[in-house]
Amino acid sequence: MTMTAAPAARKSTYAPLELFDTDRLLDADERDIAATVRKFVDTRLKPNVEEWFESATLPRELAKEFGALGVLGMHLDGYGCAGTNAVSYGLACMELEAGDSGFRSFVSVQGSLSMFSIHRFGSEEQKSEWLPRLATGDAIGCFGLTEPDFGSNPAGMRTRARRDGSDWVLNRTKMWITNGNLADVATVWAQTDDGIRGFLVPTDTPGFTANEIHRKLSLRASVTSELVLDNVRLPASAQLPHAVGLSAPLSCLNEARFGIVFGALGAGRDSLETTIAYAQSREVFDKPLSGFQLTQEKLANMTVELGKGMLLAVHLGRIKDAEGVRPEQVSLGKLNNVREALAIARECRTLLGGSGITLEYSPLRHANNLESVLTYEGTSEMHLLSIGKALTGQAAFR
């Protein structure tokens, strides 16, 4: 595998990541995957994202389009999945989130939470039943871990699965579940007499209800739901046989967080590229906004942080592909890249002036979305504590 791209001819202007020549760090297949997903985002998603964000909708038919694109479970092997490396998956996440965090969230939950939980912990029958349909988008999955009172502390979950003969009966509520109202199957985590276990719950099971959460200011082009389990009866075959304890759902979250390490950079990159184009065309005091020192200082500082985040993301991806990335390393990536992407989106909004509060320009939409990304799949505070534990050997979570 060659990692060297041909030397680029000198240009008069560069896109932010071109200054870092990050394409040189990628092989031809990785560059092709990124270009393919970017084309889909530019032609299919970006022309519609303002309408979807404003109306708080995400068309269900996008699932099959994502499936045809090959991004659903693309980093998994077999069962109709592409089996790409981690860097390719990350690059796809980056391009999707350049469109909107809602698109990357859909793909991330489908592939790294729903499909990954089945792929890693499911029986052969469960894998064969669900993974091919989830890979094509003919079926949609969701992942039920968070509860109304238990987000950063999932060990305290109150969802309970009790034995009744050979069946399981599940009760309680899950909250903030992406794709919940769209899903055909939910991976639900519950307390049992033997500890936390995972279950595959078809969403047409009696007693299962998904209630969409409305009036959101963030992730509006995404479906977020409450899942209610009221005496949901499942056969023994619904249990994920290889999921034992809290480490099982946490390993799924670590997989999804890796996609965020790249994905957040897409939101930051799109914000910055949008703002540079605006600054070059906007006349202020008889010259382009881009010609002022303060403007160039802001653009340069944002470019430095974006490029550093990209280098970190690719480095973590190479580690993941080589020997596996540790959870605290993923915490480093999510903490840094989401934090910096949010700062970039906010700063870009200021450079856009009054125009920046409209949906015509993407930075404020990205900033609103990144407020959610900052919180879900581990708050920044929890990632700081994860890093702190790695540095000191002491857990300060309580």
Where are these regions (language model features)?
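Short Gly/Pro-enriched turn/cap motifs at secondary-structure boundaries
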Residues: 149-152, 176-179, 191, 216-223
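Alpha-helical interface subdomain recognition
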Residues: 1-99, 109, 121-126, 133, ...
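A short, Trp-centered hydrophobic/proline-enriched beta-strand micro-motif
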Residues: 137-145
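Hydrophobic, small-residue-rich alpha-helical packing segments that form membrane-like cores
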Residues: 152-153, 168
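A short, charged helix-loop
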Residues: 225-251
